[in-house]
Amino acid sequence: MSYFEHIPAIRYEGPQSDNPLAYHHYDPDKRVLGKTLAEHLRIAVCYWHTFVWPGHDIFGQGAFQRPWQQPGDALERARQKADAAFEFFTKLGTPFYTFHDTDVAPEGDSLRDYAANFARMVDYLGERQHASGVRLLWGTANLFSHPRFAAGAATNPNPDVFAWAATQVCHALDATHRLGGENYVLWGGREGYETLLNTDLKRERDQFARFLSMVVEHKHRIGFKGALLIEPKPQEPTKHQYDYDVATVHGFLVQYGLQNEIRVNIEANHATLAGHSFHHEIANAFALGVFGSVDANRGDPQNGWDTDQFPNSVEELTLAFYEILRHGGFTTGGMNFDAKVRRQSIDPEDLFYGHVGAIDVLALALERAAVLVENDRLDALRRQRYAQWDDAFGRKILSGGYTLESLAADALARGVNPRHASGAQERLENIVNQAIYGLR
């Protein structure tokens, strides 16, 4: 059975085409900086927003009528969902996908049900991967939707909830390994608090760290070679989450000695909620040595919640890709579309329109970022700004050649009177615009 029989395979037709079901800028085989666009972008489609979300919101019930979401045998519906998903991936031409455990398999009424159902669906996903050539970018466990996780999973006051969560992660990590996944993501959607009046912050942080340490140990025990990634988010669904942003996650990892084991998966909309730009979070991740992967989407700056819209800003993504490219590009990570169509977009074609347009935006942004990397104008000005630190005096400070007292004495003896230099922000912004809009 075909779920998208009236929709052709999406092909590159070029910028002059007016076909809404074609790529206008994404030519997967086009080479940029020595790699194809497909190799650079490593695009993934997420299971949850695309095939699981029924189109509901807090004010209304599901608006979609997906065949695989209708009442019936839960495992049969899960197989239909997988069939629809892999038909979608294949027609879109995207090389990767991502999932939560309970996206792909019914949870059932017990842990035994969960394990049995998930095992059956992992077998089925393996068959679909083999037949299609589509690969798993990352897997994860849903430790936030069920009421048992209302007070958190790893940070829950009940150790039985901790144990249930550990069981899910154990199975999800095993499944990711078996399916050839390149990363495993840990998003602590409920790892936070609603009120400090009933919260022991130190205890919950210690519990979370213990949980992560167990995941790290299991990764090595089973021989999983992929990366473990935490996905930062400041709030929603909790008032305050412990993985607030990249810097917070890094500090947490350092505190518990996990900084060499876990990196970050950065979502654009989560950066918005944390009061940061997407560019900031990616640059910070590289500066701290924890960059892993990206969830590509956008938020609405007028809304204080996670809208998970498809990315549509070449300007925003150019700066994000500039950081990624100048640091060598993705290794195990990629661009996962953690994005959903709007509730009124009920037609099957809308799923394609959203992804096709966003993929074109990624391609445009990456090519513009490549211009910035190739012409080296931004980096040259940055190097010039800090050039004095590469002189003998600057190197001596950084290498420990001075104490605070001896440096002060040296400054007094030389009569230091430094002059302020221009930051040249306007010039730098012009360089970016020239690259984005094709001026040079």
Curated annotation (Swiss-Prot):
GO terms for cellular component: cytoplasm. The active site is at 100, 103. Mg(2+) 1 binds at residues 231, 267, 295, 338. Its EC number is 5.3.1.5. Its cofactor is Mg(2+). Its main location: cytoplasm. The keyword Magnesium applies. It is found in: Cytoplasm. InterPro entries: Xyl_isomerase-like_sf (IPR036237), Xylose_isom_bac (IPR013452), Xylose_isomerase (IPR001998). GO terms for biological process: D-xylose metabolic process. Keywords: Carbohydrate metabolism, Cytoplasm, Isomerase, Magnesium, Metal-binding, Xylose metabolism. Mg(2+) 2 binds at residues 267, 270, 306, 308. SUPFAM superfamilies: Xylose isomerase-like. It is an enzyme of class 5 (isomerase). GO terms for molecular function: magnesium ion binding; xylose isomerase activity. Binds 2 magnesium ions per subunit. It catalyses: alpha-D-xylose = alpha-D-xylulofuranose. Belongs to the xylose isomerase family. HAMAP family: Xylose_isom_A. PANTHER family: PTHR48408, XYLOSE ISOMERASE. Homotetramer. This is Xylose isomerase.
